[in-house]
Structures are given as C-alpha cells and as structure tokens.
Amino acid sequence: MPSRLRXTRKLRGHVSHGHGRIGKHRKHPGGRGNAGGMHHHRINFDKYHXGYFG
C-alpha cells in the first residue's frame, strides 16, 4: 500500500515538510540558550536588565 506516501513523498528532507514555513515545528525556535539576545530577544532583556546591551 505505497499509495499513502504519494502526497508527501516529494517533501522528504525539506525544511517545511508539509507544514508550511510559518508555525514550523523546530527543536529550538528562537535559537538555543541566549542566542539572539542582541536581536530577537532584545525586548525581554531590556525589560529586565535595562541597558545590558549598551
């Protein structure tokens, strides 16, 4: 019964594997640990550690 695969076969090994690029299921959305502190996590840092980034 390989016919079940047809729809998704081409998506194997692709970043957005049948889920689209938004709301993708990644292991570490936002990077690991403090990654992006300077960039996309800056809001939180400013809120709690004001002036941490200069």
From Swiss-Prot:
Post-translational modifications reported in the UniProt record: Hydroxylated on His-39 by MINA.
InterPro entries attached to this UniProt entry: Ribosomal_uL15/eL18_sf
Stretch forming the signal peptide: none
Residue ranges of the region described as Disordered: 1-42
Subcellular location: Cytoplasm
Residues modified to (3S)-3-hydroxyhistidine: H39
Amino acid composition bias (Basic residues), ranges on this chain: 1-30
Top-level taxon in the UniProt lineage: Eukaryota
Primary location: cytoplasm
Keyword terms of this UniProt record: Acetylation, Cytoplasm, Hydroxylation, Ribonucleoprotein, Ribosomal protein
Gene Ontology annotations for the cellular component aspect, listed alphabetically: cytoplasm; ribonucleoprotein complex; ribosome
Modification type N6-acetyllysine: residues: K47
Function description: Component of the large ribosomal subunit. The ribosome is a large ribonucleoprotein complex responsible for the synthesis of proteins in the cell.
Subunit text: Component of the large ribosomal subunit.
Family the UniProt entry places it in: Belongs to the universal ribosomal protein uL15 family.
Name of the molecule in the record: Large ribosomal subunit protein uL15
Organism annotation: Sus scrofa (Pig)
Gene symbol of the encoding locus: RPL27A
